Design a protein with these regions (language model features):
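Multi-pass alpha-helical transporter architecture, strongest
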Residues: 158-184
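Residue-level signature of mid-helix packing/kink "hotspots" within the transmembrane helices
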Residues: 48-56, 137-138
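Transmembrane alpha-helical segments of major facilitator superfamily
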Residues: 42-51, 101, 129, 133
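Helix-to-loop junctions at the C-terminal end of transmembrane segments
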Residues: 54-67, 148
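Extracytoplasmic gate region of multi-pass secondary transporters
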Residues: 4-45
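A late C-terminal transmembrane helix in Major Facilitator Superfamily
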Residues: 119-153, 160
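C-terminal transmembrane helical hairpin of 12-TM major facilitator-type secondary transporters
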Residues: 66-112
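Small-residue-rich packing faces within the transmembrane alpha-helices of Major Facilitator Superfamily
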Residues: 52, 72, 76-80, 161-168
Length: 184
């Protein structure tokens, strides 16, 4: 099960790096659009409170639909709303992009960690997943710093969107591969 576990870990890394790559620069993106720090602080506070609902969805859904379906839905929505940051000059879209990407973050990560937990009985993969998750969280802003420069937000938005969609594909591949290994 090393191959599917590696795919799941790569998916987790991409999800965290992609989200954090944009999240780390969202205030700068907002300032670039002419929003004040006070406005951005209030907007992001409300968006983060809304984001809590993602974790509540996990609580209510559990594994009723498995892990692959919620991960796929979460990454598709996250990718779509990350792409929406291209229209950050429209206040309502900027808010919705922040809120919904926050919801998908709180929703998808538990399923990715749960997927990692399915690959061994002793919990080694999921323990390593904690490390991989943190590496993704640290790498996103690093990559962002290399590409944003003087307001080049388009590149980080596109990279993050691509990373999120690739995350979904890797997670599905991991689940399908794990089932093939289990059937042997």
């Amino acid at each position: 099960l090393l191959f599917p576990a590696s795919l799941a870990l790569a998916a987790l890394f991409l999800f965290q790096a992609s989200n954090m790559g944009v999240a780390d620069y969202v205030i700068e993106l907002g300032k670039d659009q002419g929003y004040s720090i006070g406005y951005l602080s209030n907007l992001l506070t409300v968006a983060n409170v809304v984001a809590i609902s993602g974790a509540l969805l996990v609580y209510f859904l559990g594994t009723r639909f498995g892990r692959a379906v919620p991960i796929l839905i979460g990454t598709l929505i996250a990718g779509s709303f990350t792409f929406l940051f291209h229209w950050s000059q429209i206040e309502s879209l900027f808010f919705v992009a922040n809120a919904i990407t926050g919801v998908t973050w709180a929703f998808t990560v538990p399923y990715l960690l749960g997927l990692c937990a399915t690959f061994d009985e002793h919990g080694r993969v999921v323990v390593f997943a904690g490390f991989i998750s943190k590496m993704g969280l640290a790498s996103g802003p690093l990559i962002g710093a290399m590409v944003v420069g003087d307001g080049n937000f388009t590149t980080i938005i596109n990279l993050a969107t691509t990373g999120l969609l690739l995350c979904g594909a890797l997670a599905i591949w991991a689940e399908v591969s794990a089932k093939k290994f289990a059937d042997r």
